[in-house]
């Protein structure tokens, strides 16, 4: 049951509708000491990230949220009864509920709140493995963690015999073009570097609930959302990006040693999107509305919109430059 510009209420016998949720996932390998700062920063950024990158306004022919994928994924995998919801049982698709001071906070929440779906037990004794100088694979922890669908998820893994932690950012949809997706990644990684290294971190100046409200508001309204930001109050995404976040993203990419011309190219895409207010979702909605005003019914308008989308996608021109009237 998703209510946006229109409302869609359907019942499914499986999680098959979730297969419509195509995402872009960004990973950052960090040290244990740096993990909480980077995860908290990623949570702060989820709202602005999604407002800029929304690209999923239609589902089953209905105009719903700017990024319908967020609510569709949440509802399609939610098996809680009303009674369990009233008791405070957490959904497995989860934003979280607090800032963290250690990666253990998240793994402890996994155990505390979410029952095991796949009770497979490995033969490994992690403590014995450590005592012998080996690297434990922690198969049970990794399997269980993979059944908790946080929008920013902790990842423990072993690669080439070395253990590491990653922040897995699952906020963004795929598309519309490769250049848009690279720009989204540059914006995210630049801001993550700057915000996570601040002496007075942003997450100490705002409630966790405000970050979650930003995330849901951005999913619902995209570039028309109102986002809370410390020191600014409620602002529109374009104002937040153009006046505050773009310089921070540029500085973060500089710290990552990204060349100035590369920073300019991809952050220029973000700037153009913020100035025009046209992300993938806005273009799709405006195009369908224009086609319907020309006399097409909704199915025909969606079909024609998709044809144009595919054509423009292969051009690799950023979505903020796409023409609506063509």
Where are these regions (language model features)?
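N-terminal low-complexity, intrinsically disordered segments
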Residues: 1-5
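C-terminal accessory/tail domains of diverse enzymes
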Residues: 7-18, 30-326
């Amino acid at each position: 049951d998703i209510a946006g510009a229109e409302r869609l209420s359907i019942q499914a016998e499986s999680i098959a509708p979730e297969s419509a949720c195509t995402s872009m996932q960004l990973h950052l390998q960090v040290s244990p000491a740096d993990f909480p700062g980077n995860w908290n920063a990623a949570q702060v950024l989820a709202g602005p990230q999604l407002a800029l990158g929304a690209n999923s306004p239609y589902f089953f022919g209905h105009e719903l949220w700017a990024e319908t994928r967020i609510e569709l994924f949440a509802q399609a995998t939610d098996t809680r009864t009303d009674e369990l919801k009233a008791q405070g049982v957490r959904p497995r698709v989860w934003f979280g509920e607090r800032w963290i001071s250690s990666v253990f906070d998240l793994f402890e929440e996994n155990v505390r709140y979410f029952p095991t779906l796949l009770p497979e037990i490995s033969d490994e004794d992690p403590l014995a493995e450590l005592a012998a100088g080996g690297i434990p694979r922690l198969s049970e922890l990794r399997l269980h963690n993979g059944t908790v669908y946080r929008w920013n998820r902790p990842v423990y893994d072993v690669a080439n015999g070395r253990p590491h932690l990653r922040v897995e950012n699952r906020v963004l949809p795929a598309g519309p073009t490769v250049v848009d997706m690279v720009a989204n990644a540059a914006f995210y990684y630049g801001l993550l570097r700057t915000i996570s290294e601040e002496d007075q971190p942003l997450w100490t100046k705002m409630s966790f609930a405000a970050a979650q409200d930003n995330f849901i508001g951005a999913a619902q309204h995209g570039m028309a959302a109102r986002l809370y930001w410390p020191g600014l109050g409620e602002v529109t995404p374009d104002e937040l990006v153009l006046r505050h976040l773009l310089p921070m993203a540029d500085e973060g990419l500089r710290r990552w040693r990204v060349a100035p011309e590369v920073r300019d190219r991809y952050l220029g895409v973000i700037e153009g999107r913020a100035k025009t207010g046209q992300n993938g979702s806005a273009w799709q909605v405006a195009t369908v509305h224009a086609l319907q005003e020309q006399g097409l019914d909704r199915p025909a308008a969606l079909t024609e919109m998709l044809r144009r989308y595919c054509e423009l996608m292969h051009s690799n021109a950023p979505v903020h430059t796409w023409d609506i009237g063509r």
